[in-house]
């Protein structure tokens, strides 16, 4: 009821009111605030007859490079390599590799430190050989390693030149993430679980990452996302918007990507590749040569 009859152009005012007045502000509440904020930006852009990125300062680029965020459900490295060759043939220049295998197995071998590290490193090696040097990898660990495992794994994959090591350890302890970042040569990305501007400030101030991953559907919408990007710029940190959701999230992310100077790359969820997302919208987004246009 709060918004009924009010001026939808007062986006910052509403955003501040929601953030300050809500008593319990967890991820569910922040997702609701984010949805309202994205809708308000959409209303304003349509009312003024301009894309949202024009309201955010205008374009800094004409296309946005994306990486394929795909779920690979095979333990066969050869089949895995073939999947990445197929992505390359589709025009992608970057993709995610899941390196968060189980820490346990029926024979107990999965619990061995050396065995686990070797298994995940081999996965990266095989994929690199399959696609060659002109392809970037985002190594997704999903917070699945301990500090010593993350350091060992990060150092072991350095020869294969991954672009990003994402969430190697749980980000709740910022000092642990910062220690990993200080000991490996692969840039760290984190922040997909953060729901507050100040969480990102702590991550960057303690040098826990080289890339931040704000989720426009969780941090407070486009309004807060733009602030996080500006904060990252001040810390010389690049931005990789988190985007595991549907077309509204993708469209909102692209408005941000188009308007910031410190974009790293944009995540594109796997279901976008099979046309599922196109069926949800009147005008599907265009993908060409590794970029969204």
Annotate the PLM regions.
Residues 1, 290-293:
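A hydrophobic, small-residue-rich beta->alpha segment in the mid-to-C-terminal subdomain
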């Amino acid at each position: 009821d709060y918004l009924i009859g009010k001026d939808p152009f007062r986006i910052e005012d509403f955003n501040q009111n929601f953030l300050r007045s809500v008593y319990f502000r967890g991820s569910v509440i922040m997702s609701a605030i984010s949805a309202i904020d994205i809708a308000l930006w959409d209303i304003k852009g349509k009312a003024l007859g301009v894309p949202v990125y024009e309201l955010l300062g205008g374009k800094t680029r004409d296309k946005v490079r994306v990486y394929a965020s795909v779920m690979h459900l095979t333990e066969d490295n050869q089949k895995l390599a073939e999947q990445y060759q197929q992505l390359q043939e589709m025009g992608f220049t970057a993709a995610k590799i899941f390196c968060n295998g189980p820490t346990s197995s029926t024979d107990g071998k999965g619990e061995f430190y050396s065995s686990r590290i070797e298994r995940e490193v081999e996965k990266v090696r095989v994929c690199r050989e399959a696609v060659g040097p002109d392809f970037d990898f985002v190594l997704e660990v999903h917070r699945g390693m301990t500090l010593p495992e993350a350091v060992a794994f990060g150092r072991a994959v350095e020869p294969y030149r991954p672009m990003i090591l994402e969430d190697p350890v749980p980000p709740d302890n910022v000092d642990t993430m910062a220690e990993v970042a200080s000991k490996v040569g692969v840039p760290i990305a984190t922040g997909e679980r953060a729901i507050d501007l100040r969480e990102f400030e702590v991550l960057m101030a303690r040098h826990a990452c080289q890339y931040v991953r704000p989720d426009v559907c969780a941090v407070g919408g486009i309004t807060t996302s733009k602030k996080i990007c500006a904060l990252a710029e001040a810390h010389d940190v690049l931005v990789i918007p988190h985007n595991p959701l549907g077309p509204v999230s993708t469209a909102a992310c692209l408005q941000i990507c188009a308007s910031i100077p410190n974009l790293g790359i944009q995540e594109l969820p796997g279901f976008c590749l099979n046309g599922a997302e196109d069926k949800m919208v009147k005008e599907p987004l265009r993908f060409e040569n590794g970029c969204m246009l």
